[in-house]
């Protein structure tokens, strides 16, 4: 049986940069901010220390979450016109006393997004969620990193 070696910091850093490229493709501002934060974190902990393997593991887990679970929305170009029509309907409803909310127009406009779902995103169906863990008990460790959580029983 071959022993698996932990990735070195450079491998983890490259994996994290690839994950940011996949997750934030087309959004230069967010991509730049994510990469700057990754660089800052790796630069702050440049020297090898006792916690280096834990930090490498954290970077790998962060990259995996970015790659498989982060979906960005893009504002649909025609959303403004439909939001305007929707707003005029709301004004009529408010006048008649049928509606009392305040930021409905803005919420409607903000809700009109197209999601960027790429091939790496985890997909599941509701049946797998409903049946998962029905007969299992899981202890959740509060205040610990994801890699330190243990399931029991």
From Swiss-Prot:
GO CC terms, sorted: mitochondrial matrix
Subcellular location: Mitochondrion matrix
GO molecular function (one): protein folding chaperone
Keyword vocabulary terms for this entry: Chaperone, Mitochondrion, Transit peptide
UniProt KW Ion transport keyword: no
UniProt cross-references to InterPro entries, sorted A to Z: Complex1_LYR_LYRM7 (IPR045298), MZM1/LYRM7 (IPR050435)
GO biological process: mitochondrial respiratory chain complex III assembly
Extent of the transit peptide: 1-56
Family: Belongs to the complex I LYR family. MZM1 subfamily.
Quaternary structure, from the entry: Interacts with RIP1.
Biological role stated in the UniProt entry: Assembly factor required for Rieske Fe-S protein RIP1 incorporation into the cytochrome b-c1 (CIII) complex. Functions as a chaperone, binding to this subunit within the mitochondrial matrix and stabilizing it prior to its translocation and insertion into the late CIII dimeric intermediate within the mitochondrial inner membrane. Modulates the mitochondrial matrix zinc pool.
Protein name (record): Mitochondrial zinc maintenance protein 1, mitochondrial
Gene from which this protein is expressed: MZM1
């Amino acid at each position: 049986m071959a022993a698996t070696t932990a990735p070195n910091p450079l491998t983890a850093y490259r994996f994290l940069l690839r994950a940011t490229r996949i997750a934030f493709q087309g959004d230069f501002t967010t991509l730049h901010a994510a990469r700057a934060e990754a660089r800052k974190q790796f630069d702050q902990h440049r020297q090898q220390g006792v916690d280096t393997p834990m930090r490498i593991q954290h970077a790998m887990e962060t990259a995996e979450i970015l790659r498989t679970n982060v979906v960005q929305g893009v504002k649909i170009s025609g959303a403004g016109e439909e939001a305007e029509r929707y707003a005029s309907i709301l004004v009529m409803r408010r006048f008649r006393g049928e509606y009392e909310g305040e930021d409905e127009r803005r919420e409607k406009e903000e809700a009109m997004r197209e999601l960027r779902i790429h091939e790496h995103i985890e997909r599941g169906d509701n049946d797998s969620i409903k049946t998962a863990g029905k007969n299992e008990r899981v202890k959740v460790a509060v205040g610990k990193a994801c890699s330190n959580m243990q399931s029991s029983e």
